Every structure is written in structure tokens, then in C-alpha cells.
Amino acid sequence: EIGVRLVGSEMCIRDRDERLFRKIEDKIKRAIFDYGLINDGDRILVGLSGGKDSLALVDLLGRRSKIYCPRFEVVVAHIVMTNIPYCSDREYLRSCAEEHDLPFIVHETSFDPSTDTRKSPCFLCSWTRRKALFEIAKAHKCNKIALGHHQDDILETLLMNLTHQGAFGTMPPRLRMDKFDMEIIRPMCLVEERELIQVAAWKGYRKQLKNCPYESGSSRSDMKELLRSLEAINPEARYSPVSYTHLRAHETDSYLV
């Protein structure tokens, strides 16, 4: 009888996790069609850092690319910052891409934080990675770059801009970069971070070792706490119309921060 209960409990947990994964897939499908993120014939580069968000994006887009409509191709790239002491399991990341028959590229680059003291090292690192993705995308004939930003990232960036820039702006689902003749898309823009945390545990995504010397200086963790505080006041705060005004238009400019 105890064994039956244990088996029944495991089945309930598996069913719950599978329902959550399908829910996330539905959110991505809605984002794709509502914001015109992916069209027939697109060749999309996905940046795979090794964190739960990018692992989930490779998993989800890899599965989605096998569906008939829209028809698109996915290429996966892992950017290695040689001046930051962190370690990623490249073979594991390669296996995650190859699980969906996706090409996997490793690209090494670096940045010098002393070249522009007006910008934070986190900004310079992010921009260097982004520039590398543009170069890889061009080299592999990709017309779009998919990033693993989720709903929490978008709302936290909104709060950062309001707090530090006094401006109402954040990362849009689709961003046209005319300078590079490229589009950046965020297919997980409607997915909550807590949903991805559950999926990562269910899927068993491996955590990558990281020891970034600049991480503690980031204000994003403060914005996470601020978002939690807002939700404590109003559990529906993240779904308010004000939070979603940035999703109504497809920006062609760079967002702030």
C-alpha cells in the first residue's frame, strides 16, 4: 500500500511538471504569434550561457522548430569571456543542443573594463557578448538572435530604468537593430522566472560554475527584491496594464540601462 501511494505521488508530480512545461510552451507560442517574433524561413541564433533560462530556451525552441508552423532553423552559440574566471561544461551544453539536432558553436572573446569607466563591467560584458552574437549570427546566415530573458528580467529592467534613469523603458519582445541588420527576440517574455526554476529542477539542468568578480556590484538583485515587495503589496502587480505598456510596440531603438 505504501508503494502504491509513492508511485501515485510520483505520477502526480510528473503530471504537474508536464502540465507546467506545456503551459510554458503555450506562453511561447502566444508570444511568437502576438508579437511576430518568428516567421517562416527564419534562421535564429540562440545564446546559450548555461544558465537555466538559456537552457530552457534551447529546449523549447529546439522542440518548437520541429513543428510545422512557422518553419524555422535554430543555431546555438556559447560565448566564453576569457577574462572572467568562470567555468562552463561545454560538452554538456553541446549535448543540450545536439539533443534537438541543433548546430553548436563556441566563441571566445574578452573585454577591458578600464576602457570605459563610465560604464559598469556588467554592461561592458553584456555588450561584448551581444556584439559576438551579432558576428556569429552574420557568419552563420541568421537573421534573428533569441535571448533567454523572461518576464521577471523585463520587469526588473523596467524598475532599474525608472530608478536610475527616470525613464519608462525596458526590453521589448522584438527589437530591430538596424545598425546590424538583425532582430533580437525574446520568446520567453511572458514566462515567469519561478516557472523556469520549476522546469529546471524537473528537467535536471546542470548548474554551471561561475565566479564573476563583478556580480556583487550589480543592482539587478535590488530590483528583484523590489519586485517581490511590489508583489507582496499586490500579488497581481506584475500583470498590471502599466507593466505591459512596453509590449504594445516593437521598438527600433536600444532600451536604456
What are the residue ranges of the model-derived segments?
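Generic structural signal for well-ordered, non-membrane alpha-helical segments
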Residues: 21, 126, 216-219, 234, ...
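Functionally engaged cysteine thiol sites
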Residues: 12, 121-128, 209-216
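An accessory alpha-helical subdomain
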Residues: 226-244
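Catalytic subdomain that performs nucleotidyl-dependent activation
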Residues: 144, 152-232
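Single conserved hydrophobic/aromatic residue that forms the stacking wall/gate
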Residues: 1-13, 246-257
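ATP-dependent adenylation/nucleotidyltransferase module used to activate substrates
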Residues: 16-158, 164, 194-202
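Ser/Thr-centric signal marking residues that sit
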Residues: 157, 170, 245, 251-252
